[in-house]
Amino acid sequence: MSNKIISLGSIEIANDKPFVLFGGMNVLESRDLAMQIAETYAEVTQKLGIPYVFKASFDKANRSSVNSYRGPGMEEGLKIFEEIKSTFNLPLITDVHEVQQCAPVAEVVDVIQLPAFLARQTDLVVAMAKTGAIINVKKPQFLAPHEMRHIITKFNEAGNDEIMLCERGSSFGYNNLVVDMLGMDEMKQTGYPVIFDATHALQRPGGRSDSAGGRRAQATELARSGMALGLAGLFIEAHPDPDNAKCDGPCALPLHQLENYLTQMKAVDDLVKSFEPIDTSK
């Protein structure tokens, strides 16, 4: 098995390359907050030498409650993305939920994300594939790791082979997620880059009745465990005031902890990727 390398400008994304950070905020709350968070990430990752892609959503279409904040919408969101891209010279990743969003989003954003709940929607997969953008596929909480090959095949047959696979936890009874570390290794066997979404994996879906709960206090332990597998990337979300974030605050890393957190993740990644592989199947 060879590791596929995805090129994003000067960034190389592959399971045997130094990890790439996909990080930012859950949903765009305001232009000013997005700029503040992007600036912090840009400064920290440049200092630590970590390749970086800014992440935020313009619309959270799958909130638990109809009254929950969803975001500024695509038109306003893309304006904010353009400003972040030009100000900080950062590549961007965001998610789409509808076929008609794919083309306009791909004109601004470098990586388009297929949400976990929508990963089997063929029309959306085809529309995303046809943009030619790099695709980040969130593994649904209800699918086994080996079933991701079917989604890969859909993208391939629609003409797109620039695919990353993202683990964000598996359903474990009601209102709980667990991370299958061996499952991530199984996804690595496809050769495609595997990304670990360490913050969403901390969710307790529906754990606060009308919104998701989370286990922010375990963010470091979970991410270190995932990085020990030797992955292509880490996906995290941070907020300067997680307790008052408009979405997924219970999972968000406090922004002031970002440098310490990433210093540890880089140390784990560097160490693991310095080892010679051991084939214990023989």
UniProtKB/Swiss-Prot annotation:
GO BP term, pick one: keto-3-deoxy-D-manno-octulosonic acid biosynthetic process
Predominant location: cytoplasm
Compartment(s) where it occurs, according to its Swiss-Prot or TrEMBL record: Cytoplasm
The entry's keywords: Cytoplasm, Lipopolysaccharide biosynthesis, Transferase
Gene3D superfamilies per the UniProt record, alphabetical: Aldolase class I (3.20.20.70)
GO cellular component, one term: cytoplasm
EC number(s) from the headed UniProt entry: 2.5.1.55
Catalytic activity: D-arabinose 5-phosphate + phosphoenolpyruvate + H2O = 3-deoxy-alpha-D-manno-2-octulosonate-8-phosphate + phosphate
Pathway info: Carbohydrate biosynthesis; 3-deoxy-D-manno-octulosonate biosynthesis; 3-deoxy-D-manno-octulosonate from D-ribulose 5-phosphate: step 2/3; Bacterial outer membrane biogenesis; lipopolysaccharide biosynthesis
Pfam families noted in UniProt: DAHP_synth_1
Domain of life assignment: Bacteria
Cysteine pairings via disulfide bonds: none
Gene Ontology MF term list: 3-deoxy-8-phosphooctulonate synthase activity
HAMAP family: KDO8P_synth
Entries under PANTHER family matching the protein: PHOSPHO-2-DEHYDRO-3-DEOXYHEPTONATE ALDOLASE
Family classification: Belongs to the KdsA family.
Protein name per UniProt: 2-dehydro-3-deoxyphosphooctonate aldolase
Species of the source: Shewanella halifaxensis (strain HAW-EB4)
Lineage, opening ranks: Bacteria, Pseudomonadati, Pseudomonadota, Gammaproteobacteria, Alteromonadales
